[in-house]
Swiss-Prot record:
Organism, as annotated: Ehrlichia ruminantium (strain Gardel)
Localization of this protein: Cell inner membrane
Any Pfam family: NADHdh
The name this protein goes by in its record: NADH-quinone oxidoreductase subunit H
Chief location of this protein within or outside the cell: membrane
Keywords on record: Cell inner membrane, Cell membrane, Membrane, NAD, Quinone, Translocase, Transmembrane, Transmembrane helix, Ubiquinone
Catalytic activity field: a quinone + NADH + 5 H(+)(in) = a quinol + NAD(+) + 4 H(+)(out)
Membrane topology listed for this record: Multi-pass membrane protein
Subunit structure: NDH-1 is composed of 14 different subunits. Subunits NuoA, H, J, K, L, M, N constitute the membrane sector of the complex.
Entry keyword Transmembrane helix: yes
Role: NDH-1 shuttles electrons from NADH, via FMN and iron-sulfur (Fe-S) centers, to quinones in the respiratory chain. The immediate electron acceptor for the enzyme in this species is believed to be ubiquinone. Couples the redox reaction to proton translocation (for every two electrons transferred, four hydrogen ions are translocated across the cytoplasmic membrane), and thus conserves the redox energy in a proton gradient. This subunit may bind ubiquinone.
Length: 367
């Protein structure tokens, strides 16, 4: 009997490890494929806005264009500048790409229901359901700037170094606003677990959703700056810095920066969906909408936000650098601070602060 218990515990340990490994592989492959076709979607949408055709040669409707681009980058020769620091030059894009993937460890893609002692429990479908998920995401996004700084410094190029400095100051400036907008959500939900936040937001009164709506807009604009996307793509300003911090990169090192940028776009869109747009739940609490799996709703909402990223790139001119800094420190920071105080006061006055956090591993289904 003792040997059987040892075998059973060993089997459970191995099976849980294999399941975790499979989850990681599935998420990595999904993110990589999503990045490839996000580039295709961006080229098609911008072409449609500019009354062009876009990619249409490789495969039906140009659907194989991402694979052609990948093959082109793989077979190119990586060129390292003569006076560059070779080790730092090569490790910088790896850091950026790895950190872009690490953030997905705590993103819940959906949920499933289990029955325990006759009671239905909601469990989030996530790789690591840690109780400091929000802090983990903020830490990973903050570390992303190191890859860019190392790339700019190691290239031994004035253009690359200026782009890296711009990127560092820009990301640090807007991380403050992102953090404060997330604080307003935490005040209303009372949890740092992303799965709990989604379920708590789903069960909230509509007036709290309206109260947090301005923060959703501010979070999205700050996400544009955080990911160095248009109109805040000043670190890559072609007219001034030729290409910014990645000006000396080619072949796969350049592709890793490219993949990291677009993976961060999808990650920030997923965070916005989790914090402000209901996660994997349908947009309306109507019974027939629940027929569609929650993961489909989650992906659908992310695609809508990514379309907004692309639409803004095709429509709005680039900001000047001083305007970008002024917007971050003199507009977004005071407004987000004021909104934290306002939300706190309203929640206390209406006795709507969360009374307690939910269970660490499972979530009770609301009737």
């Amino acid at each position: 009997m003792h040997n059987y218990n040892i075998f059973l515990s060993f089997y459970n340990y191995i099976s849980s490890g294999v399941l975790l490994f499979l989850k990681i592989i599935i998420v990595i492959i999904s993110v990589m494929v999503s990045v490839a076709y996000l580039v295709y979607m961006e080229r098609k949408v911008i072409a449609a806005i500019q009354l062009r055709q876009g990619p249409s040669v490789v495969g039906p409707f140009g659907l194989l264009q991402p694979f052609a681009d990948a093959i082109k980058l793989i077979i190119k020769e990586p060129i390292i500048p003569f006076k560059a620091n070779k080790l730092c030059f090569l490790i910088a894009p790896v850091i950026t790409f790895t950190l872009a993937l690490l953030g997905w460890a705590v993103i819940p893609f959906g949920s499933y229901i289990i029955v325990d002692n006759g009671q239905e429990l909601i469990v989030p479908n996530v790789i690591a359901n840690i109780n400091i998920g929000v802090l983990y995401i903020l830490a990973i996004s903050s570390l992303g700037v190191y890859g860019i700084i190392i790339a700019g410094w190691s290239s031994n190029s004035n253009y690359a170094f200026l782009g890296a400095i711009r990127s560092a100051s820009q990301m640090i400036s807007y991380e403050v606003s992102i953090g404060l907008t997330i604080v307003t959500v935490l005040l209303a939900t009372g949890s740092l677990k992303l799965g709990e936040i989604v379920i708590a937001r789903h069960n909230m009164p509509y007036w709290i959703d309206l109260l947090l709506l301005p923060m959703a807009f501010m979070f999205f604009i700050s996400a544009l700056a955080e990911t160095n996307r248009h109109p805040f793509d000043l670190p890559e300003a072609e007219s001034e810095l030729v290409s910014g911090y990645n000006v000396e990169y080619s072949s796969m090192p350049f592709a890793l920066f490219f993949l990291g940028e677009y993976a961060n776009m999808i990650l920030m869109s997923a965070m916005a969906v989790i914090f402000f747009f209901g996660g994997w739940y349908p947009p309306l609490n109507v019974s027939f909408l629940y027929i569609i799996p929650g993961t489909i709703w989650f992906i659908f909402k992310i695609v809508i936000l990514l379309f907004c990223f692309i639409w803004i790139r095709a429509s709005i001119p680039r900001y000047r650098y001083d305007q970008l800094m002024r917007l971050g420190w003199k507009v977004f920071l005071p407004i987000s601070l004021f909104w934290v105080i306002l939300v706190s006061g309203i929640l206390v006055y209406t006795d709507s602060l969360p009374k307690n956090t939910l269970n660490n591993t499972v979530y009770y289904k609301e009737n």
